[in-house]
């Protein structure tokens, strides 16, 4: 069985040195505390104690910082999912796990159904905006997870579980379906406590839709 790993990239957004990690960590905290409105360059500088020049040496502005948050989040997600599915019995079982985990979100890992709601809703809004404003950079940021899904689909084709087709394109379709639906759900839940039962039911519905679309 393959050892799934997030692809390595030399993209400056994805490669985080210690200073970049400090900045991205501050962005995470600000999004958790105040949502998108709280994520300003001034707030990041105050939180990190960095000089303005030190931040602008790494990020041209707020959009680049948000892209770095996406890149870091999706790369870590791909690594975690790769480890989680490594011992599952077949490609469809592995993809099922990933789709379900994306829909359920943070609670799939630590059982916290309320943590990170502001951040998740804020990032959903930014994902939709950056898909139009910075599509190439956003695609690079999310590519580790799409590449992982493509690898699993390719193996599913080899084992006769997944219909023949271009794995990368099919992976993009799966990701877009899942992520767009999750964004809508997160924005609907922004001012409320997440509905655990509804989220679980949604995961089942989305997986069934994906399964029927890719099944051999």
Region roles according to the model:
Residues 26-30, 101, 105, 177:
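Short amphipathic alpha-helical elements of helix-turn-helix/winged-helix folds
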Residues 33-37, 88, 109, 159-160:
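Short coil/turn segments at alpha/beta junctions that flank glycine-rich nucleotide-binding fingerprints
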Residues 16-27, 44, 69-73, 77, ...:
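Generic hydrophobic, amphipathic alpha-helix propensity
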Residues 103-151, 161, 168-169:
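Short secondary-structure transition hinges
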Residues 16, 20, 66, 70, ...:
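Amphipathic, non-transmembrane alpha-helical scaffold segments
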């Amino acid at each position: 069985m393959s050892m799934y790993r997030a692809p390595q990239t030399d993209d400056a957004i994805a490669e985080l040195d210690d200073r970049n990690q400090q900045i991205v960590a501050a962005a995470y905290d600000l999004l958790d505390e105040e949502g998108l409105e709280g994520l300003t360059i001034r707030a990041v500088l105050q939180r990190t104690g960095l000089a303005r020049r030190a931040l602008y040496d790494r990020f041209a502005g707020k959009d680049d910082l948000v892209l770095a948050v996406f890149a870091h989040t999706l790369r870590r997600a791909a690594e975690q999912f790769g480890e989680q599915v490594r011992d599952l019995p077949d490609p469809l079982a592995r993809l099922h796990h990933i789709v379900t985990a994306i829909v359920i979100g943070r609670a799939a890992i630590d059982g916290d159904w309320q943590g990170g709601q502001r951040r998740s809703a804020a990032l959903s809004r930014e994902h939709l905006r950056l898909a139009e404003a910075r599509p190439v950079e956003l695609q690079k940021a999310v590519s580790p997870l799409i590449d992982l899904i493509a690898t699993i689909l390719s193996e599913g084709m080899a084992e006769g579980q997944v219909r023949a087709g271009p794995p990368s394109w099919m992976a993009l379709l799966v990701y877009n379906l899942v992520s767009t639906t999750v964004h809508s759900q997160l924005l609907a839940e922004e001012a409320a406590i997440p509905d655990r039962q509804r989220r679980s039911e949604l995961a089942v519905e989305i997986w069934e839709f994906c399964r029927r679309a890719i099944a051999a």
